[in-house]
């Protein structure tokens, strides 16, 4: 049975523990960044940050400042278009693991031409893949494939202190998502699940997706 994540943003405090744990587990170096007037750091996904917590600050109709936090990562699509696009250029550059549902960029992705690698990245409806300028490989969340294959949770899920993130069999996560949604609606009437049928990373949002991030949802 394929796996799935549930990311309940109503519980997220933007501690960024998931973001840091991901870097540590994948042994990725620190990024040198500059203050841009936002708490979001780094400003975007990059080859050294496969997961980031996005910050969206706005003022509601009552003049109250509202924060919306969005832990962004690859959605591990049920039907990943990135795999199809990559296969047309270099078969096996991107694959989907049948057992877990993880969408993975392999070492063959370094053989993609710059134009083909760009096409793979631009095919993603969630703007996830990045191209490592040093290795030329496509980089993105790999569902902690090594950990999951060994029966462990992804490191971001294990690290999360608030229960924002959950991981398990897809059917179990769908059931948990519906349960969490029912609870969230008692506090957030506009709460909803995003692109449930199309992805393996199910987001529960308290408000419209536009209040989180441009690519928070596709449908």
Curated annotation (Swiss-Prot):
The species this protein was found in: Nitratidesulfovibrio vulgaris (strain ATCC 29579 / DSM 644 / CCUG 34227 / NCIMB 8303 / VKM B-1760 / Hildenborough)
Residues binding [4Fe-4S] cluster 3: 74, 77, 82, 124
Pfam family, one: Fer4_11
pH dependence, record text: Optimum pH is 9.5.
Name of the featured protein: Formate dehydrogenase 2 subunit beta (cytochrome c-553)
GO cellular-component term (any): formate dehydrogenase complex
Induction details: The trimeric FdhABC(3) complex is the main formate dehydrogenase enzyme in the presence of molybdenum.
Domain 4Fe-4S ferredoxin-type: residue ranges: 3-32, 132-171
Localization, UniProt: Periplasm
InterPro entries noted in UniProt: 4Fe4S_Fe-S-bd, FDH_Electron_Transfer_Unit
Lineage: superkingdom: Bacteria
Required co-factors: [4Fe-4S] cluster
Gene Ontology MF annotations: 4 iron, 4 sulfur cluster binding; metal ion binding
Keywords: 4Fe-4S, Electron transport, Iron, Iron-sulfur, Metal-binding, Periplasm, Repeat, Transport
Binding site for [4Fe-4S] cluster 2: 22, 141, 144, 156
CDD domains: W-FDH
Temperature-related behavior of activity: Optimum temperature is 51 degrees Celsius.
Subunit structure: Heterotrimer of cytochrome c3 FDH2C and formate dehydrogenase FDH2 alpha and beta subunits that forms the FdhABC(3) complex.
Task of the protein: Beta chain of the formate dehydrogenase (FDH) that catalyzes the reversible two-electron oxidation of formate to carbon dioxide. The beta chain is an electron transfer unit.
Binding-site residues, [4Fe-4S] cluster 1: 12, 15, 18, 160
Cofactor note: Binds 3 [4Fe-4S] clusters.
Major place of residence: periplasm
């Amino acid at each position: 049975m394929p796996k799935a994540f549930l990311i309940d943003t109503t519980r997220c405090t933007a501690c960024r523990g998931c973001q840091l744990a991901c870097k540590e587990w994948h042994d990725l170096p620190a990024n040198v960044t500059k203050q841009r007037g936002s708490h979001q750091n780094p400003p975007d996904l990059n080859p050294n940050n496969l997961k980031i917590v996005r910050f969206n600050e706005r003022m509601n109709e009552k003049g109250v400042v509202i924060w919306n936090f969005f832990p962004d990562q690859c959605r591990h699509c049920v039907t990943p278009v990135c795999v199809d696009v990559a296969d047309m250029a270099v078969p096996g550059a991107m694959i989907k693991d049948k057992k877990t549902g993880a969408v993975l960029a392999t070492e063959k992705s370094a053989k993609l031409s710059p134009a083909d690698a760009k096409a793979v990245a631009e095919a993603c409806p969630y703007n996830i893949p990045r191209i490592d300028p040093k290795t030329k490989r496509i980089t993105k969340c790999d569902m902690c494939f090594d950990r999951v294959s060994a029966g462990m949770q992804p490191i971001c899920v294990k690290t999360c202190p608030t229960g924002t993130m959950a991981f398990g069999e897809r059917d179990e996560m769908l059931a948990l998502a519906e349960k969490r949604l029912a609870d969230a609606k008692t506090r957030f009437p506009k709460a909803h699940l995003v692109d449930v049928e199309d992805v393996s990373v199910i987001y529960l949002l308290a408000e419209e997706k536009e209040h989180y991030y441009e690519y928070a949802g596709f449908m």
